[in-house]
């Protein structure tokens, strides 16, 4: 059985993420979408909330499961018996950063990284940009799954109420 891990912060999951996950799922028997935990960053959503949103958003992909991990991604991949990491690339800046990570991961563990070019429809899309635009009232409804969009608007409203 071939498997891959598809890591990210997914804060929140976007349609761009889902495009890459779906395309990876078409290539591998199993894809583990892994929410990487960075304790130095305070996300808009908790890790548990991100997992819930990912599980809901990928429920129609039977060979996809969702998990989280704190530590080196290659350690997780080895623990799961996974030999490939899948990363989406939006452009040259992503490639420059991700290539160095891929080479380091390969050196540390022998785990290879496969790059999937992002669908041009989503090449501008990032979770950070979506959050920023939504915070200022911009319409991001076509950039996220419907339920994720609703949760994003609710969380932004909560944060606004807390700060006023």
Swiss-Prot record:
The keyword Magnesium applies. This is Phosphopantetheine adenylyltransferase. One of its GO terms (cellular component) is cytoplasm. Pathway: Cofactor biosynthesis; coenzyme A biosynthesis; CoA from (R)-pantothenate: step 4/5. The gene is coaD. It comes from Rhodococcus jostii (strain RHA1). Reversibly transfers an adenylyl group from ATP to 4'-phosphopantetheine, yielding dephospho-CoA (dPCoA) and pyrophosphate. The lineage of its organism: Bacteria, Bacillati, Actinomycetota, Actinomycetes, Mycobacteriales. Substrate binds at residues 9, 41, 73, 87. Homohexamer.
């Amino acid at each position: 059985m071939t498997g891959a891990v598809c890591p990210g912060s997914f804060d929140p999951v976007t349609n761009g993420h889902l495009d890459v996950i779906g395309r990876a799922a078409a290539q591998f028997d199993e894809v583990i979408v892994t929410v990487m935990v960075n304790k130095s960053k305070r996300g808009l959503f908790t890790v548990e909330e991100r997992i819930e949103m990912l599980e809901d958003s990928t429920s129609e992909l039977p060979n996809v499961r969702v998990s989280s991990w704190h530590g080196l991604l290659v350690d997780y991949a080895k623990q799961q018996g996974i030999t490939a990491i899948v990363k989406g690339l939006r452009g040259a800046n992503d490639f420059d950063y991700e290539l160095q990570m891929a080479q380091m991961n390969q050196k540390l563990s022998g785990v290879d990284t496969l790059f999937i070019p992002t669908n041009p429809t989503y090449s501008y899309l990032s979770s950070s940009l979506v959050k920023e635009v939504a915070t200022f009232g911009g319409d991001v409804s076509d950039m996220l799954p419907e339920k994720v969009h609703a949760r994003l608007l609710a969380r932004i409203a909560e944060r606004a109420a807390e700060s006023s």
